[in-house]
Amino acid sequence: MLMSNLLILPLLLPAVCALGLVFIRTHSRLSRIFSIGTMAVTTVVSLLLLIYVMYHKPIALDFGGWQAPFGIQFVGDSLSLLLVTTSSFVVTLIMAYGFGRTEKRAIRYYLPSFILFLTVGVIGSFLTADLFNIYVMFEVMLLASFVLITLGQSVEQLRAAIIYVVLNILGSWLLLLGVGLLYKLTGTLNFTLVAQRLNEMDDKSSIVIVSMVFLIAFSAKAALVLFMWLPKAYAVLNTELAALFAALMTKVGAYALIRFFTLIFDEHSGITHPLLVFLSCITMLIGAFGVLAYRDIKKIAAYQVILSIGFIILGLGTNTIAGVNGAIFYLANDIVVKTLLFFIIGSLVYITGLRQYKSLYGLAKQEPFFGVAFVVMILAIGGVPPFSGFPGKVFIFKGAIENGNYIGLALMIITSLIAMFSLFRIFFVMYLGNENKGEAIVFNKIPTYRKNLIGVLVAMIIVMGLAAPLLFKVTDNATHLNMDDGLYEKMVNPHLIKGDK
């Protein structure tokens, strides 16, 4: 009972903090300290819950004492708590990164609150175990993210916000339509009972149609092929928000695809999963063309986000234990790596005041620290051992071979090399290029605490790579829980297995 009640804390702590910041919004320093402390505590609580789940069983919290399927239910399993812990960790660093900001009062006053509201939506999406509440949490994210995109009130931000909101609202409508159709088919919203009843149904065509609705809805959220909103939105954000969006927004969509297409729509993998592989291949190609086509380092970073979604969904599409295992590992890894990517890119823009990488020379002497961090980040993105991108890609590689997805496998290898090439191209110009070739650049000094935060992420990437066997115990537990027939139902809601009550 105690552990079940503690499951609400990762959601409750940032929610209460976000509301509390409204009353102390004019005290910028106090607001930052309060929000950073809250997210640090949230990270610790989430990690303790994850450790408990690994040694015991998933935690289920029935709100108001109403047992599933009648009440709202949160479930903390190894998949959700791994992502909650990782997300809370990077949000803590993101809040700390913006500690010394000096923008207009409106931005300083309200930025921390809406970052926390967005975090509430993200964590709620990971923890909720019913269809309608995942829609609600997606809407919380959408509203908070819309405010964050438009907070500076520049023309570029408003233009990017229009594209972002239109596509995400369409995705939300499709998600709500899918929830309604699935409720009509099964008569319930609870994940456990939905999965059980779909497996018992004979009308397979209706299930496939509904699964396609969810696939399109979550693809819009994850930037799986439907990527149009992402590059412009990320390019207009400051470093803090760009890192937040890159780390979390698309990852929630990827999580939803993994959860739904392993647990709920697993019986129709002959149709849905080859389509997932196809979409992942298209997404990898889009990302690869994007990172090669642009010279703006913020847009190159944005297309790196799209490219990584292709890798994750390829693992899911293989419909193998190894592939899904790798997808979950790479998903958690990518939350950390993309935070580091945007921290570094944002810091380089701050130092030089420029975004076109061909104009940047002479950083090797000015900021050698960023050169080291940049190389570690590139190797992690490329999947080079011993860094954190390697283990996940190896298992996705294995899953693709087991399933015979050789085209997807080849594309993953080629686009990984392209991703590394596009970033090494920036590195060679910035750090090894002739500093007398371009115009003279006035370098700004970056605060030491921001370098320290980048150092923490670099260390985290190395630790995740070296601790891969330990992390794979978590991801393997998550994979089997969602893919093994009846295991999720038995572990989370055993009272529903023998019939509805």
Swiss-Prot record:
| Leader sequence residues | none
Q: Which GO terms describe its cellular component?
A: plasma membrane
Under InterPro entries, the record lists:
CPA3_Na-H_Antiporter_D (IPR050586), NADH_UbQ_OxRdtase (IPR003918), ND/Mrp_TM (IPR001750)
Return the Pfam families for the record. Answer: Proton_antipo_M (PF00361)
Q: How does it sit in the membrane?
A: Multi-pass membrane protein
Q: Where are the transmembrane segments?
A: 4-24, 33-53, 79-99, 109-129, 131-151, 162-182, 207-227, 245-265, 274-294, 309-329, 334-354, 369-389, 409-429, 452-472
Q: State the protein's name.
A: Putative antiporter subunit mnhD2
> Gene behind this chain?
mnhD2
